Every structure is written in C-alpha cells, then in structure tokens.
C-alpha cells in the first residue's frame, strides 16, 4: 500500500511539473506573438495585419546607388523607425520571380523600383498577371502607369502607380542650364572653368539609361526648358542625346560625355544611374558642368555639378507605408499617385554648392537667374507653361522647339 501511495505521489508530482512546463511554454508563445504584433497589429484595432512587413525590389542600379533606390530604402527605414514596420530589400534580375516569391511569402505591400511591368500587369508565358494571382497584395510601381485598359479604366485594383513630375523639374534644369551657359563668363572665374563660348558652346548633352517613358520624361522636359530660355534670348541650341547609356558603366559615361564636351557642349545631363558618376568625373576633368539626378549629388563634384534633378522616392514610400500601417490602403489602391514640385518629392536643388563658385562680380547676375527660375516655376505651377509628360502618355513634338536642333531624336 505504501508503495502504491508513493507511486501515486510521484505521478501527481510529475503531472504538476509537466503542467508547469506547458504553462511556461504557453506564456512564452503569447509573449512572442505580442512582440511580433508590434509590427503586425490586428485589424480590429484599426490597423492592418502587416504580416512579415514590406518588401522592396531595387532597380538594376542596386541599393547603394546614392539616389533612386537608396532614397526609397530611407523611406522604409523611416517607416520602421516611426511606425514599427519591418522591411526586406531584394536585389534581383528576376523581377517576376521575386514578385511571386514575396507575395507567396505573405508580403502584403511590395514596392518594385525596376522598370519591368508585363508579368505583373499583363501576365507572360500564358500565366495570369501576378497582380491577379495575389489580389490581397498591393504592388507599387514607379515611373509609368501601365495599369490601364484600352478604355482608360484601371486593370488591377491592387496596383499603385507612382509618378514624379520630373518633366517639370527637368524643364527647370534645362532653363537653368541655358541661363548659366549664356552668362558663364559673368558668373565664374575663368581660371576654374574651360567653357566653350559663343555659338560653338550653345550645345547641351543628355544621357539616358534606356528609351523608356521613365527616362524620356527627363530628356523631353530638359529639351523644352532649354528651348524656352533660348527662345526668350533669341539664340539657338543643339541638343545631343543618347538613350542607350545603360545604368552601370561609369567609364562609358565618361567617354560619351567627353564626345559632347569636346564638340563644344558645356553641360551634360545624365539620367543613367552610375553612368552619371563618369559624366561628373569627366566634367571635373575638362572643367565644365554636369547635371545629376534622383538625389542631391551636387557635392559629389563640387563646382562641376550644376544641379541635381530630384526624384525623392522616400516621400511616396513612406506615405504609402503609413497608409499600410493605418489600414487605409483603399486611399491608394488602383490609383496613380503624382508628386509635383510643391510636394518636395521632385524639383532641383537649392544650388548652394554651385553658388559657392559664383564670383563677387557675378552675384547680381546669379540672383537675377534665380529670380527667373522662380518665375518659371510659378508659371509651371499655374499651368501657363505646359511641359510634355511622357509618363502620362503625352507625345513629344520636337518640331515645336523652334530654337533647338535635336539631331539624335
């Protein structure tokens, strides 16, 4: 009997021990679940189930491009800091495959910065569009709006198209380039630069990474800005362009830019990722000017980068991430989100870096130029100046640019 009692006591103790272990495990799981819910609150609280967080696929230029991609990642980092949302950055050559994998892994918000939309919007190889396969995932694309049917209606309610009014910012850059080119001898110390003067120097170059709406939108706006000022001043310019520069070969960018500089161009604008680094370096070498893009890169080659046309992807990435956190994706789903000069997501830099090179004698003329730029900006905002927007489907008509020759377009 005593042995039976001992056995029963042992069994009761064992049961209590096991019960305590499982209770401890249960508490641990609850704790882990609560911790993850810092980033994935339930919809009953007014915020969305964020799943694993937000995914972002970079463009070919990669995450360390000092511009387009890096700015977008900064938006995600801000969303993580301010809103508690985790994120994943993917660098890939297989955009459709990565979109599918990420959506399949539970990501409900995916940004894709590469100009590659067919598999997402139309479907390829007999497959349904990825957007249709994953209707509960929002896909955000940039620099074009392919998410429309022939009648203008929206194809997929879970696709967001982000457009920057870089055509307007590029117009400003073109106007600035012409004003500076016409007054270079008054603005700068001749010992610091080797500008080509007179008609021989009334030439400008443009390097684009690809012949796509997301790139031509810069070139066309730039050309129109040059023509606008050239017409006002009664002079004629030549616009050299190459839309096959790619995005990674900086040495090739330097070589191509040098052909423009050697032919008399004083300013070359590059919209081509790392190719622009080569253009900037060549501008410094030959003592002329370049124009950069995406982020404020004026200080990369101080005094040789005239300005940068800004495409601040941080602004829309953070805004959309906040809607995601607030369970308010209905505000953006299926829509085209456009960011103009006033939004802070596009424009040109404040010119403070190049301004340090303006001579004392050139200060009055420089202030006059900045005043002219302000007037032009106001006219764009009011609609008095209309700039071709290739991203929105506007057709570019170079025959309307009476003061600009475009031999390559």
Language-model segments: which ranges?
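Bacterial signal peptide processing site
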Residues: 26-29
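Bacterial N-terminal signal peptides that target proteins for export
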Residues: 1-12
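Repetitive helical segments and hydrophobic/amphipathic motifs
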Residues: 15-16
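C-terminal motif of bacterial Sec signal peptides marking the signal peptidase cleavage site
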Residues: 19-24
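A residue-level marker of the well-folded mature domains of exported/periplasmic proteins
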Residues: 32, 36-409
């Amino acid at each position: 009997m005593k042995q039976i009692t001992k056995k029963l006591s042992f069994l009761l103790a064992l049961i209590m021990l096991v019960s305590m272990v499982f209770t401890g495990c249960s508490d641990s799981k609850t704790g882990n679940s609560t911790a993850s819910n810092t980033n994935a609150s339930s919809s009953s609280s007014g915020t969305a189930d964020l799943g694993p967080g937000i995914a972002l696929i970079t463009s070919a230029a990669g995450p360390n491009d000092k511009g387009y991609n890096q700015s977008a990642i900064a938006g995600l980092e801000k969303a993580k800091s301010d809103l508690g949302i985790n994120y994943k950055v993917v660098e890939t050559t297989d955009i459709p495959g990565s979109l599918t994998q990420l959506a399949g892994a539970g990501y409900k918000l995916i940004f894709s910065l590469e100009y590659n939309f067919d598999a997402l919007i139309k479907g390829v190889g007999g497959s349904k569009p990825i957007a249709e396969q994953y209707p509960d995932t929002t896909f955000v694309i940039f620099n074009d709006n392919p998410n429309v049917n022939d009648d203008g209606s929206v194809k997929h309610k879970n696709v967001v198209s982000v457009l920057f009014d870089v055509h307007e910012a590029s117009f400003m850059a073109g106007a600035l380039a012409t004003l500076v080119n016409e007054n270079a001898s008054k603005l700068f110390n001749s010992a610091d630069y080797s500008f080509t003067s007179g008609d021989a120097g009334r030439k400008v170059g443009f390097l684009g990474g690809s012949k796509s709406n997301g790139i031509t939108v810069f070139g066309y706006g730039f050309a129109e800005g040059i023509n606008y000022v050239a017409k006002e001043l009664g002079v004629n310019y030549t616009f050299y362009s190459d839309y096959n520069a790619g995005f990674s070969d900086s040495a090739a960018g330097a070589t191509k830019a040098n052909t423009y500089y050697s032919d008399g161009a004083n300013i070359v604008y590059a919209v081509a990722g790392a190719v622009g680094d080569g253009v900037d370096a060549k501008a410094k070498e030959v003592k002329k000017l370049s124009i950069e893009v995406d982020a404020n890169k004026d200080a990369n080659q101080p005094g040789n980068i005239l300005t940068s046309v800004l495409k601040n992807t941080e602004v829309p990435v953070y805004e959309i991430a906040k809607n995601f956190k607030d369970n308010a994706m209905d505000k953006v789903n299926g829509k085209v989100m456009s960011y103009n000069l006033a939004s802070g997501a596009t424009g040109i830099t404040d010119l403070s870096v190049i301004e340090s090179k303006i001579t004392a004698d050139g200060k009055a003329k420089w202030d006059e130029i900045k005043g002219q730029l302000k007037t032009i900006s106001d006219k764009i905002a009011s609609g008095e100046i209309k700039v071709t927007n290739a991203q929105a489907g506007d057709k570019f008509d170079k025959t309307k640019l009476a003061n600009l020759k475009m031999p390559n377009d």
